[in-house]
Every structure is written in C-alpha cells, then in structure tokens.
C-alpha cells in the first residue's frame, strides 16, 4: 500500500474518531475512549505513511472536490512525510495519555475527543495541501480546533489565553493569505503550488512574499515578538494537547517558512538577507525564550517559553541554510537544513514528553506551581525518570537527541561563518554565541525545574500525598522518552536519512546535493555521531560507580535527617524556584521588562481586535439587527476608530503603521 493511500486512510479514521466522540457525547466515558483509541489507530497509519514518504515513496493526489476553481491537491513528499511522522508520534502518545487524562474534564470528554481528532486531521491536511485554497482552509481549521481545546475549561484564564491565541493566529493567517494571494496574482491566477514553483518572481515580489509568510508563520511558531500567546495558551490546554501544540502545531510554522522560502519561491532563488533575517530572529528568540523561562514557577509556562527558545534554535539552522544556498555553498546548506530538521523532530519528542510529565504532576498534585511540589521522585518514580530524560535531552546533554541536533547546528554556523561573506560571518558568529548562551541557561533552568519538583522534601500536602499516574499516562511518557534516547544513540543512522530529506528540499536533483551534504556531515560530525560510544561509556561508568559505592558502604550507611545548622529540617528550608534563579533573574531584569512590553503589544492587538469586531450580548430579531442595529453600529465604530487615531496608544499606532506598510508593499508590487 503506497504512502498516500495510508495517509488518506488515516485522515478518514481521524474523522471517524471525531464523529464517534460526537455521537457518544452523552456517554462521557464511551466518547472519550472511542475518540482516544480511534485517534491512536489513525496516528499509527499516518506514521507509517510519513515514514514511507521520508524513505522516498512520494505521492500526490489531484481531484476536484466541492470547488472547481480549487482542485483538491495533496503532496506527500520527503519533507511533508517527516512532519506527518512527527505529528503522528505525538498524536499517538496524546491519544493513549488522554484515556486517563481527559477524566479531568467531566462532562466535556466527548468534546475533547472531537476537537483532538479534528485538530490532528487539520494539521495533517495543512502539511500535505498543495493548493492555496485547501491550505488556508486547513490552516484555519487547525487554529479553530486548537482554540476550542485551549478554552475547554471555560474559566477566566483559559478564555483570556484562548482569545490572545485566537487573535495572534488570525493576524498570522492574514499575513500568510496576503503572501499566497500575491504569488497567485503573479502566477497567472493559479491556486496550485506547482505553478508557484515554476514561476520566476522578481526579487522584489519574492521578498515581499517571503517576509509576509515569515511573520505569518512566525506567529504560529511563536517567534519573538509574536510569542505572547504561548505562555498564555499552552498552560490552559489539556496537557496532551499542550504536547501536541508545542511539539507539533508550532512546527507547522517552521514547515511554512521552509515551504515558502525554499520550495514555492525556488525558481526565484533564495536571497542572502532572507537567511540573515531568519538567523537574527532565531538568535533573539532562543536567548530570550530561555531567559523568560528561568523566571517561571508555573511548570507549563516554563515549558511554553522553552518552546520559543527551541523554535529559535531551529531557525538558526534554517537561516544558515538559506544564506549558504544563496552563496552556492550547497554542502553547508544541506548540513544546516539537516540540523534544523533534526532539531525539529527532537524538540517535538522531548517537549512532548516534558508536557506529558507536567500533566502527570498536575494530575497527581493538582497544581502547576513548582514551589508547591518537591519530593516527587519517591512518589512518582516512573514520571520522574521520564521527565529526567526529557530534561537531559532539552539541555543538550549527550547521548540524548538534543545534543546531536545542536551539535550539527553549531557546525553549520561555524562553516557558514567561513564562507567569505562579511555579513554572513557576523550574523553566524552572533548566532553561535547566542546558541552557547542558550545552552548554558537551559541547563540552569532544568536543574531548577527538576530539582525543585522532584528532589528534596514535599512542600505541600498535595505533594506529600501524590501517587504515580495510571499506566496509560506512564506509557505515553515512556514512549517519548525512549524515542529521545533512540534519536540520540541512533544518530549515525538517522542523520544520513535527514541529509537526503534536506537535499530534496533544496534542489530537485537531491542526490547531488545529498552527496555534498553527506561529505561535510562526515567531516564535522564526529562528536554527534559518536553517541552510541558515549552511551556505552556512560552505562559502564555509572555501573562501576554504583558498584564501587555499594562495596565501600556495606554496613556503613545510616539514614538520618539532613544537617540544618542545629535546627529541625522542614519543608521551607530547601532552595525553591524563586531563590534558585534569583541571581540570573536579577542580572537579566532588562530582558524581563522587554518581555512585559512585548506581551503588552500582543494584548493591545487582541483588545484592538475585540473592540473592532464587537461582542454580541443578546439575541435580537434578525430584521432589527440587520436593518437598524447594523448601520447604527457601523457609524459608531467609524466614529470610535476616528477618535482612537489620536488616542495616545502607541501600540495601536504601531498596528496602523504595520498595516499601512503591508498595503503599500502589495500595491507597489502590483503597480510595478
């Protein structure tokens, strides 16, 4: 069975899972079980389809469905197959996890099953759509279904977080649509992506389209300064949904940037400054993301900020690849893109595991506040071990997967800096320094997160009474933790496959590019691909250390309370999250001020959107609503907008400037 047949079957099964959840909605547990189990089956099918595509079984579909002007075109190639496989793993783990975790939402389990399956199906359609119309339809469906999952608790925090996400998502949607429609206009009015690939746009048009799509998809990916919705929305969603959003959905932002910059605009050629811009935003996002995470005590907000950090790391590889491609350094371009794709998959796995671990802590203790945890290693050992693996992976500790992809990213940046272009050299060195700072702060942050949550003594009654989560939740965490280990130790096998995927993106004659990328990878990847040896050495050393300790301490170990300067130990004495990061927080206070201002801008956009659209407060007769109220409110809104032009709100002024700039750019391109 070919990859497209399997993919369509998985899509149909996801739709069946969503339908089953709705039909059984009055039987809460049955709806949950049906939605989760059917969703797991769909994920297995789509994973197999994705892997087949990655290994070279690229297929497509082109047929007319509903709209003659927009053919239903799907393309499952090596790049889209990789993202399909990535989301499938998270969807499978999330479905199994949901068998117990959705019990936290009584009366809403059927709703959760429906939106979860629809969310997964819409992401799959976004990745494979090969037509503007269906891409935008699927993208909007993805945003809407994830919004309803964010607000499922229907409390004040979830509604506020969901609203901010909804607005930023649609700001991004408008920018993406503007980019695609501009390409459509210059491609003879065609909606087919295939025609975009064959059209040689002028440098100005290509640049406008890329910039619009970069910020549009960047809003979905959570790059700074469009990141404000992540720490608001991710903590409010169910934890398996948070894992899918952070591990999967924001990667669609990366997919979109790659698709436009390196695929749809391929006939026009990549420009050096595109890569430099991407690297600069990547460096800023990586450093600020981890700096903001350090100050957090809410474990899910902390993980959300780390998503910003890792999106930044991925963009470093993407930007280096674009810059190298523009300079005809194809080997470096392939190496850098391979590093970005590797880290994309790696981040999905360890961030998915960490969010599931955070959900397990919330499930057992009833809180996301790390200050109220402590001592959970003894009470939740399986969760503690899985979370530790995720923490080591995200901190880039060998032999785990985060180390491998970050090592390749370093090598691609160093090689890009030596290509002779002064601007590329400066930005690449800046990016490498930013990556080093990010790595150091990430280790600090996860020593804090793990130590405060799992070590020491319980600091609340809930932590003292915590128990290990049910088996399905442990299995889901263990699966993703095991994949983190496999992706690290299996680097010698996995990296060449990803080199082939990267080469297929950068050039239709991928074999030539793959050979150059493979040669460069073999030259500079010794440490990254030696992870099996590192793993064996670590196992041997740990075994020797444990054996030595066992022999030396036989009959000599006595258990006693820790020394506390003569005072009786209590739960308030251990170092907590606040004091652990106090020195770093003091040093980086200006960055936290910047974060507050960025968040304020996001909220200003949300409030502006809310005032612009208005909110229906009551049900009224349709004729009155249409004939009387609508014109009246239209005049009022025009008057309010005229007044707000001089309202003194600088954030709104910025919105006007950006909107006007986009309009003028589009008009200038069309007139030129």
List each language-model region with its residue ranges.
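Transmembrane helix-loop-helix hairpins at membrane boundaries of multipass inner-membrane proteins
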Residues: 1-9, 16-114, 186-200, 500, ...
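Hydrophobic core of alpha-helical transmembrane segments in multi-pass integral membrane proteins
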Residues: 15-19, 39-50, 91-92, 180, ...
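Hydrophobic transmembrane alpha-helices and their helix-loop junctions in integral membrane proteins
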Residues: 93-110, 116-135, 145-468
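Aromatic-capped, Gly/Pro-kinked transmembrane alpha-helices
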Residues: 493-536, 547-672
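Hydrophobic alpha-helical transmembrane segments
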Residues: 74-88, 203-217, 423-439, 515-542
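Membrane-entry segments of alpha-helical transmembrane domains in multi-pass membrane proteins
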Residues: 1-9, 72-86, 125-137, 272-277, ...
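Hydrophobic alpha-helical membrane-insertion segments
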Residues: 37-50, 170-178, 387-399, 476-499, ...
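Membrane-interfacial helical/loop segments at transmembrane boundaries in membrane proteins
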Residues: 59-68, 192-198, 408-420, 494-524
């Amino acid at each position: 069975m070919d990859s497209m047949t399997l993919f369509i079957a998985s899509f149909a099964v996801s739709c069946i899972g969503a339908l089953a959840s709705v039909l059984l909605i009055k039987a809460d547990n049955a709806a949950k079980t049906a939605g989760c189990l059917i969703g797991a089956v769909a994920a297995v099918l789509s994973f197999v389809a994705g892997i087949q595509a990655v290994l070279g079984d690229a297929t497509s579909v082109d047929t007319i469905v509903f709209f003659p002007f927009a053919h239903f075109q799907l393309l499952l190639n090596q790049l889209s197959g990789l993202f399909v496989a990535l989301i499938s793993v998270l969807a499978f783990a999330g479905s199994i996890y949901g068998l117990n975790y959705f019990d936290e939402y009584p009366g809403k389990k059927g709703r959760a099953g429906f939106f979860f399956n629809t969310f997964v199906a819409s992401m799959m359609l976004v990745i494979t759509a090969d037509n503007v119309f269906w891409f935008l339809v699927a993208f909007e469906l993805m945003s809407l279904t994830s919004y309803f999952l964010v607000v499922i608790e229907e409390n004040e925090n979830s509604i506020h977080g969901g609203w901010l996400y909804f607005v930023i998502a649609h700001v991004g949607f408008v920018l993406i649509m503007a980019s695609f429609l501009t390409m459509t206009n210059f491609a003879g009015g065609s909606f087919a992506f295939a025609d975009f690939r064959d059209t040689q746009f002028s440098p100005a048009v290509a640049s406008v389209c890329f910039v619009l799509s970069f910020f549009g998809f960047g809003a979905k990916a959570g790059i700074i300064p469009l990141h404000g919705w992540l720490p608001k929305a991710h903590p409010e969603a169910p934890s398996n949904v948070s894992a899918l959003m952070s591990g999967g959905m924001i990667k669609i932002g990366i997919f979109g940037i790659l698709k436009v910059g390196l695929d749809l605009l391929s006939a026009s050629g990549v420009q050096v400054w595109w890569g430099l811009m991407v690297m600069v935003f990547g460096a800023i996002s990586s450093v600020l993301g981890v700096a903001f995470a350090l100050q957090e005590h809410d474990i899910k907000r902390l993980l959300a900020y780390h998503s910003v950090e890792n999106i930044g790391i991925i963009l470093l590889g993407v930007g280096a690849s674009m810059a190298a491609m523009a300079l005809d350094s194809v080997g470096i371009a392939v190496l850098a893109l391979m590093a970005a794709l590797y880290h994309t998959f790696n981040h999905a796995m360890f961030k998915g595991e960490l969010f599931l671990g955070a959900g397990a802590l919330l499930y057992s203790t009833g809180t996301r506040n790390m200050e109220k945890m402590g001592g959970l290693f003894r009470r939740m050992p399986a969760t503690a071990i899985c979370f530790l693996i995720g923490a080591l992976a995200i901190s880039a500790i060998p032999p785990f997967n985060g180390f491998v992809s970050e090592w390749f990213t370093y090598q691609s940046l160093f090689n890009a800096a030596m290509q002779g272009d002064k601007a590329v050299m400066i930005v690449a060195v800046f990016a490498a320094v930013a990556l080093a700072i990010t790595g150091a702060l990430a280790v600090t942050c996860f020593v804090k997160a793990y130590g405060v949550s799992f070590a020491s003594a319980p600091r609340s009654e809930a932590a003292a009474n915590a128990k290990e989560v049910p088996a399905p939740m442990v299995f889901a965490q263990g699966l993703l933790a095991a994949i983190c280990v496999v992706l690290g130790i299996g680097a010698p096998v996995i990296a060449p496959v990803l080199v082939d995927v990267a080469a297929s993106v950068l050039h239709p004659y991928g074999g030539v590019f793959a050979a150059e990328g493979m040669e460069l990878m073999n030259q500079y990847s010794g440490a990254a691909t030696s992870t099996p040896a590192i793993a064996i050495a670590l196992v041997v050393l740990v075994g020797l250390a444990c054996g030595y300790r066992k022999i030396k301490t036989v009959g000599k170990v006595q258990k006693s309370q820790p020394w506390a300067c003569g005072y009786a130990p209590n739960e308030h004495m251990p170092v907590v999250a606040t004091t652990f990061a106090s020195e770093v927080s003091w040093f980086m206070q200006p960055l936290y001020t910047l974060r507050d201002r960025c968040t304020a801008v996001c909220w200003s956009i949300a409030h502006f959107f809310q005032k612009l659209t208005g909110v229906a407060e009551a049900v009224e007769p349709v004729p009155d609503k249409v004939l009387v109220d609508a014109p009246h409110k239209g005049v009022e809104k025009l008057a309010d907008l005229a007044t707000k032009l001089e309202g003194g709100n600088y954030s709104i002024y910025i919105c006007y400037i950006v909107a006007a700039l986009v309009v003028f750019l589009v008009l200038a391109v069309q007139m030129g």
